[in-house]
């Protein structure tokens, strides 16, 4: 007959085994993400901010095919996610279309990232080693993400492969994304600033004058409007000013003729009409 102590020991061991399996499964199902180059916990704040900026692209996959058979290759790229089929941390892979061979160009567990005003450079290191080039160093992928405010992410294309050097070889890719754009800063023009200032002054004048007329002077009705008499006569003042500026001759222009007074008329002789009378 099995002792209670032995049975309890077996139960505890079984529970520990089940717990270990559960932890391992959770680790396997947890999706990996970018690991910046450098000591853990001492990553650059700027690099971490840039990776967070690219978060909307984490669930997207980008593919581009180049060449012609039998030298046709397909490149698959993902941001901080597995792009290959072997869970090797590959962020960018090259697939030979003729035989299906997959080559890891760069892994996201060795990531570098930096940016400029309208671009972001994402670098994956730690790819598969070259066979006969670049001193057999590991491959490296450089993805240039340029600003395009009209798309979240598009136009992923390989540009070139630099492998004519002894070291520091790389694959260069490009793509467009609005995430690489700097925030738009709206600037007010000089005219807009003047209009805002003028509107503010007018509002202060009307409100302040209204309160003064009502509370201090004790005005009622239309008389509460500041300088009411001036504004009522403004039309006449403008008309007078326009007349003064625009008229082309003086107001009191001397007449081109003068009237003749009665004293200047001589007495006409009536004799010159006598012959017209009937005889």
From Swiss-Prot:
Annotated source species: Bos taurus (Bovine)
GO cellular component: a single term: late endosome
Gene this protein is translated from: M6PR
Subcellular location: Lysosome membrane
The keyword Transmembrane appears for this protein: yes
Chain segments carrying region Disordered: 258-279
Residues spanning the signal sequence: 1-28
GO molecular function terms attached to this record: protein domain specific binding; retromer complex binding
Extra information: This receptor has optimal binding in the presence of divalent cations.
A Pfam entry, by short name: Man-6-P_recep
Ranges of the Lumenal topological domain: 29-187
Gene3D superfamilies given in the database record: Mannose-6-phosphate receptor binding domain
Predominant location: membrane
Membrane topology: Single-pass type I membrane protein
Segments passing through the bilayer: 188-213
Name recorded for this polypeptide: Cation-dependent mannose-6-phosphate receptor
């Amino acid at each position: 007959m099995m002792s209670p102590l032995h049975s309890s020991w077996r139960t505890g061991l079984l529970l520990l085994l089940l717990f270990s399996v559960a932890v391992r499964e959770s680790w396997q199902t947890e999706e990996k993400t970018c690991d910046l180059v450098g000591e853990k916990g001492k990553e650059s704040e700027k690099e971490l901010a840039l990776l967070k900026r690219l978060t909307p692209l984490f669930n997207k996959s980008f593919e581009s095919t180049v060449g012609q058979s039998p030298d046709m290759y397909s490149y698959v790229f993902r941001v901080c996610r597995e792009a290959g089929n072997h869970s090797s941390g590959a962020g960018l892979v090259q697939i030979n279309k003729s035989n299906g061979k997959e080559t890891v160009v760069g892994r996201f567990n060795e990531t570098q990232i930096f940016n400029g005003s309208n671009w972001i450079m994402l670098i994956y290191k730690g790819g598969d080693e070259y066979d006969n080039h670049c001193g057999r160093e590991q491959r490296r992928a450089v993805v240039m993400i340029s600003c395009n405010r009209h798309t979240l992410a598009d136009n992923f294309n390989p540009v070139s492969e630099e492998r004519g050097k002894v070291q520091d070889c790389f694959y260069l890719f490009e793509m467009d994304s609005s995430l690489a754009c700097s925030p738009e800063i709206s600037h007010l023009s000089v005219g807009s600033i003047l209009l805002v200032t003028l509107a503010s002054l007018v509002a202060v004048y009307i409100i302040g004058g209204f309160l003064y007329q009502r509370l201090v002077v004790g005005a009622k009705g239309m008389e509460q409007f500041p300088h009411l008499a001036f504004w009522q006569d403004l039309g006449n003042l403008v008309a007078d000013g326009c007349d003064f500026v625009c008229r082309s001759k003086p107001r009191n222009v001397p007449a081109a003729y003068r009237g003749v007074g009665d004293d200047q008329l001589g007495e006409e002789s009536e004799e010159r009409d006598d012959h017209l009378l009937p005889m």
